[in-house]
């Protein structure tokens, strides 16, 4: 089975304030969706990659919860239709083109596959600030196992993932006979805050 390994960082896929210090208190806590976000970084490649751009994409986490009673667990969901291409260096019309391609059937097909979600299967505490979370990530209608190494700092829980688009049934965009394209690997970054 394909496996993506999530490492400490920052996007920002796969996952946030899950059973960290709150694990000692048996309770379920929601994520603060006004401050919790997912980011995807897409990188250029190809012979004429100097003419292309890397892309930064962001969406709010739509809902999520942490269960600290019994077996710690975490789950969250992002609406793929709310992903937005940031790319401040691109002109508005070019940014709109990238957005349209990303949303369309060639890439995310977000009108058909609107849900991006993660559900943990096990949680292992490494030390006071670090955890390893094993679970399943669903993207583009495909579910794959992932391993998340997460870190807590200043009330935020951050992690990052390097995923292969092809593992989730997405063919990396390629134009001009492949002289300009994006890499199969993308970085997914998470910044998650628990609700008060």
Predicted segment positions?
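Bacterial N-terminal signal peptides
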Residues: 9-18
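Low-complexity, acidic/polar, glycine-enriched regions of mature
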Residues: 22-196
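Bacterial N-terminal signal peptides that target proteins for export
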Residues: 1-10
């Amino acid at each position: 089975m394909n496996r993506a390994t999530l490492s400490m960082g920052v996007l920002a896929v796969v996952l946030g304030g899950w059973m960290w210090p709150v694990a000692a208190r048996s309770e379920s806590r929601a994520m603060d969706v006004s401050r919790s976000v997912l980011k995807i970084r897409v990188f250029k490649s190809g012979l004429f990659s100097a003419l292309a751009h890397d892309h930064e994409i962001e969406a709010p986490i739509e809902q999520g919860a942490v269960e600290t009673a019994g077996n710690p667990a975490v789950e969250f969901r992002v609406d793929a239709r709310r992903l937005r291409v940031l790319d401040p260096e691109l002109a508005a019309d070019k940014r709109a083109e990238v957005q349209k391609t990303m949303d369309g059937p060639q890439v995310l097909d977000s009108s058909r596959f609107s849900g991006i979600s993660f559900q943990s299967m096990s949680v292992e505490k490494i030390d006071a600030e670090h955890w390893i979370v094993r679970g399943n990530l669903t993207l583009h209608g495909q579910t794959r196992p992932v391993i998340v190494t997460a870190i807590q700092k200043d009330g935020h829980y951050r992690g990052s993932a390097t995923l292969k688009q092809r593992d989730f049934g997405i063919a990396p965009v390629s134009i001009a006979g492949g002289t300009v394209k994006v890499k199969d690997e993308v970085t997914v970054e998470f910044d998650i805050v628990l609700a008060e």
